[in-house]
């Protein structure tokens, strides 16, 4: 711990080493867990209620993909969390395995994946709905707020949450899109594995 020097951190992230808030940390947990309701709320739509199996499979695949990417990256990078640099934080909080899991933010990536998935599926099933702008506004705001709270809580640097947001949003948007049937009937599917993600192109 004594060898850690904030001066070695890039200018964008450096100021985050002074952040540490249990309240912000707990609030980010609430947003993460609350985002799990977003895919479930899709069932309120009549069109989607008639096709729950497909939506459930797509959401499960989205969760597996974002989980795999996030976990593999954390273990590969092992970036030290901002609070570890903070001298006011107790030493015992800085020595756990979680202290080196900063890059990238799992809370942000999972939240973005959930909300963007819900918005993407809603837009597909209700392409002419007047609620689409509202749905997309909520979908983009919740993970942004989650990322802010993770930085405020000292758990992540700004670049951690920006990356997490991008990965989660891309996953939540792309997985349903890849499964959409085109006019040709051809489909492209993501197949998550333990240590990789594959693509299957099916021609009908």
Label every PLM stretch briefly.
Residues 40-43, 147:
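Solvent-exposed, amphipathic alpha-helical segments
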Residues 43-48, 119-123:
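Structural signal for the C-terminal ends of transmembrane alpha-helices
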Residues 1-39, 76-92, 98:
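N-terminal transmembrane-helix/juxtamembrane module of multi-pass inner/ER membrane proteins
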Residues 21, 25-35, 50-51, 59-67, ...:
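Soluble non-cytosolic domains of exported or imported proteins
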């Amino acid at each position: 711990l004594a060898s850690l020097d904030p001066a070695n951190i890039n200018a964008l992230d450096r100021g985050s080493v002074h952040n540490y808030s249990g309240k912000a940390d707990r609030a980010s947990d609430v947003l993460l867990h609350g985002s799990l309701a977003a895919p479930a709320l899709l069932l309120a739509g009549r069109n989607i209620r008639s096709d729950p199996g497909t939506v459930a499979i797509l959401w499960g695949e989205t969760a597996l993909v974002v989980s795999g990417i996030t976990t593999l990256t954390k273990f590969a990078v092992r970036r030290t969390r901002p609070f570890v640099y903070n001298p006011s934080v107790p030493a015992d909080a800085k020595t756990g395995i979680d202290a080196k899991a900063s890059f990238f933010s799992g809370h942000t990536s999972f939240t973005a994946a959930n909300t963007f998935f819900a918005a993407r599926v809603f837009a597909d099933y209700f392409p002419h709905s007047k609620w689409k702008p509202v749905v997309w506004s909520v979908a983009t705001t919740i993970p942004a707020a989650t990322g802010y709270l993770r930085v405020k809580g000292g758990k992540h640097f700004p670049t951690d949450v920006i990356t997490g947001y991008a990965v989660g949003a891309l996953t939540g948007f792309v997985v349903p899109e890849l499964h959409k049937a085109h006019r040709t009937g051809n489909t492209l599917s993501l197949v998550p594995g333990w240590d990789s993600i594959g693509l299957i192109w099916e021609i009908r």
